[in-house]
Amino acid sequence: MILLGVNIDHVATLRQARGTRYPSPVEAALVAESSGADLITLHLREDRRHIQDADVKAMRPVLKTRMNLEMAMTPEMLAHALQVAPEDVCLVPEKREEVTTEGGLDVRGHYADVKHYTGKLTEAGIRVSIFIDPDREQIQKAFDAGARVIELHTGAYADAPHASEREAELARIREAAEFGASLGMVVNAGHGLNYHNVKPIAAIPQIAELNIGHAIVAHALFVGFPQAVREMKALMESARAR
């Protein structure tokens, strides 16, 4: 069984584009859950470009599955996470000038911070994952820092312009997933996954969960949000069933 985390950031992006009260990320989360999502992922960025504090607070008590809150390692975000108390927090790198998260967190370069934030969140009963590139050293450092969950960054795979490069990136992800699992870690993956490239990733047996947002929200424009979620879940499950 493989789980689908629906990222609802870009529902909020559409709302923020006009400064309206709609579409509601909370409503989108509930629709995603009723359509087969196993958890809801959202990124409260420091610049608040899409998800807002009020979205997180309103969503927390009404979700029937799990909340996976993505956040940068800052005192402000730690305070928010401790107050909201989601089931999961995923520590991610963040740059104000980026369009979307550009790569995995450099655990080796920020080891002390990763260990500190992982410890504080774990003490509060929140499961911590680290968004990292599919690299053995980064995975080992995440484990050493106390994380027992990782999310492998699949962006290089998704953006590979040629089949040979895509296969090479897929091999890296497979190896990373195997290594993480050998340490006893829960291995998730995400970033840039869509209806055309998700199946090879979903077929990796060590991967427990995929977090996907932009592709689902975009496809929903044509087929509706419930159907977009159902189609993605079906693709993932068919890949795993082989």
Swiss-Prot record:
GO biological process: pyridoxine biosynthetic process
InterPro entries per UniProt: Aldolase_TIM, PyrdxlP_synth_PdxJ, Pyridoxine-5'_phos_synth
Record-level GO cellular component terms: cytosol
Subcellular localization: Cytoplasm
Record site: Transition state stabilizer: 151
Pathway involvement of the protein, from the record: Cofactor biosynthesis; pyridoxine 5'-phosphate biosynthesis; pyridoxine 5'-phosphate from D-erythrose 4-phosphate: step 5/5
Binding site for 1-deoxy-D-xylulose 5-phosphate: 9-10, 45, 50, 100
Active-site residues from the entry: 43, 70, 191
SUPFAM superfamilies linked: Pyridoxine 5'-phosphate synthase
Residues in coiled coil: none
Assembly behavior: Homooctamer; tetramer of dimers.
Its job: Catalyzes the complicated ring closure reaction between the two acyclic compounds 1-deoxy-D-xylulose-5-phosphate (DXP) and 3-amino-2-oxopropyl phosphate (1-amino-acetone-3-phosphate or AAP) to form pyridoxine 5'-phosphate (PNP) and inorganic phosphate.
Name of this chain's protein: Pyridoxine 5'-phosphate synthase
Lineage: Bacteria, Pseudomonadati, Pseudomonadota, Betaproteobacteria, Neisseriales
